[in-house]
UniProtKB/Swiss-Prot annotation:
It comes from the Bacteria. The gene is rplQ. The keyword Ribosomal protein applies. This is Large ribosomal subunit protein bL17. One of its GO terms (biological process) is translation.
């Protein structure tokens, strides 16, 4: 009896799926953080975790295996020279997935996948002071009437 493998197909053929996951993995290793759909992020995590574990061996054979999966010299160099050194003694769990709001347009579930040791501390959102709408909208009747009142009020004092 045929059994289904526990993996997402992502609506693609096997070759297209493999290329997509390879490209997402490459971009994650180069940029340290990417935004994609939740399903792609979860599948990318599986690939990246295995690649980083192989890279931790540091052998020439491991480097060739990783290059076979990524097909990008820059990403392989970044992985072996910088990422592996920074990860150090961490045993797995190299990535983190943060769920985001649904994408506008098709309401697809979105997520950010990032390398754990490269996560930036969240910065406080800039405080924006509210202005009177009449001041923001040039040429509005309210803005003109208020400016005339202020001019008239200055003359009375």
């Amino acid at each position: 009896m045929r059994k289904v493998k526990p993996a997402r197909k992502l609506g693609r053929t096997s070759a297209h799926r493999k290329a997509t996951l390879s490209n997402l993995s490459t971009q994650l290793l180069i940029h340290k953080r990417i935004e994609t759909t939740e399903a792609k992020a979860k599948e990318t995590r599986k690939v990246v975790e295995k690649i980083i574990t192989k890279a931790r061996k540091g052998t020439h054979h491991a480097q060739r295996e990783v290059f076979g999966a990524l097909r990008d010299k820059e990403a392989v160099r970044e992985l072996f020279e910088e990422i592996v050194g920074r990860i150090g003694s961490r045993n797995g769990g190299y990535t983190r997935i943060i769920k985001l709001a649904p994408r506008y347009g098709d309401a697809a579930k979105m997520a950010v996948i990032e390398l754990v040791d490269y996560a930036e501390a969240p910065s406080a959102a800039p405080v924006v002071s509210k202005q009177d709408r009449a001041k923001r909208v040039k040429g509005s009747k309210k803005a003109e009437s208020r400016s005339q009142e202020n001019e008239g009020g200055d003359a009375a004092e």
